[in-house]
Amino acid sequence: MFLGTYAPKLDEKGRIILPAKFREELASGLVLTRGQEHCVYVFSQREFQSLHEKIRQAPVTSKQARDYLRVFLSGASAEVPDKQNRVTVPPALRSYAGLDRDLVVIGAGSRAEIWDAEAWETYLAKQEAAFANTEEEVIPGLF
């Protein structure tokens, strides 16, 4: 499970050093893809395989499902960390998420997310008030 918030830097070659707490789960490989709210999702190979099995069940007759799958999967990139635990974020994903040198990597349970640091701060500031006022209906049975 991915938890926490980290602040790595993107190097000049577009690489990021994985947070130490994420390395074991991602050591054998990972998949980077477009995330919602213009971040980059990071899935372990195992989690992405599970997700892909669910995605395959989406009806081909649904235009909304086809559109989502095209955007989500066309941006996917399988990567393996190097010996220094660095992963290259492909240029298209860096551009999509507006990634600059300063990043924030957050744990989001089944995945990690890579955000431009400024974009994350803006997003978090907007969401904190809503978080404090979240009703049980958003995630029934949570509290």
From Swiss-Prot:
Subunit structure: Forms oligomers.
PROSITE patterns: SPOVT_ABRB (PS51740)
One example of a Gene Ontology biological process annotation: negative regulation of DNA-templated transcription initiation
GO CC entries: cytoplasm; nucleoid
Protein source organism: Leifsonia xyli subsp. xyli (strain CTCB07)
Keywords: Cytoplasm, DNA-binding, Repeat, Transcription, Transcription regulation
MF terms in GO: DNA-binding transcription factor activity; transcription cis-regulatory region binding
Domain SpoVT-AbrB residue range list: 5-47, 76-119
SUPFAM superfamilies: AbrB/MazE/MraZ-like
Stated name of the protein: Transcriptional regulator MraZ
Originating gene: mraZ
